[in-house]
């Protein structure tokens, strides 16, 4: 490869720039070439509507993919949970690096946990903000089953503005992704890491996707050095579940694949999935376990298998509008 700088397409948010900066450093190391960040504004960044209203699927991705297809950038970095499950033929998912913490976290007033926030008190119902129907469904279900007084409030905006709602007293707490706070150096503001048994994360949460043109074999080979096979297998299974449910990335679907080990030896992969009504009145939550997938097709099959079981239990009726 020549010494010409590689152009990395990124969203302009603080989080996206932090993620892309970390990937740029890694790509410089594996290629020996300079990498420059090219900032691109996406529809999801400029629209003030709630993601559930603007469709969710692909709103942060389309502009980056268009820039790739036009040859304005050489590769792009996405939050994998924002990536539509259908992969365009012209683009390759060249690398899925090692995943960050996939959990959701609570940032609450007075250092409180979710249970403490929702405990009956003279202050009345606790108001907890999130932009995600998936989080709303599971938080509301947990509150219902534990007798907590919690109202989930839809919010938008970047991490700073979301945490700002708590600091200003407008909300009692907000729920965010741990990985995002890690990447911008604000993890110390977390008041509780929410167990995945309480809130399953979004499919692919905490993972990054590095995409480039499918016909750029040299770049695909170089970027492949950043790929983590276990992370790729896990997120492939999670996203296969999402696709088989015919749900978009703003649907109330949670999924997490993790590896089960016997001592130091990884023996199986467990996939958990949940779908629910946003008021938390009904949840379908199931899991399946199988051999660790060794191919893309095996990982896809694990997701489809669990989706079929969830659909048989009535998952489709809980998602509102399904995508076609």
From Swiss-Prot:
EC code(s) of this entry: 2.5.1.61
Transmembrane regions: none
GO MF term list: hydroxymethylbilane synthase activity
Annotated signal sequence range: none
Co-factor remark: Binds 1 dipyrromethane group covalently.
Post-translational modification S-(dipyrrolylmethanemethyl)cysteine, affected residues: 249
One GO term describing the cellular component: cytoplasm
Xref: PROSITE patterns: PORPHOBILINOGEN_DEAM
Reaction catalysis annotation: 4 porphobilinogen + H2O = hydroxymethylbilane + 4 NH4(+)
Gene Ontology biological process: protoporphyrinogen IX biosynthetic process
Stored NCBIfam families: hemC
Subunit structure: Monomer.
Biological role: Tetrapolymerization of the monopyrrole PBG into the hydroxymethylbilane pre-uroporphyrinogen in several discrete steps.
Family classification: Belongs to the HMBS family.
Identification of the protein by name: Porphobilinogen deaminase 1
Species for this entry: Streptomyces avermitilis (strain ATCC 31267 / DSM 46492 / JCM 5070 / NBRC 14893 / NCIMB 12804 / NRRL 8165 / MA-4680)
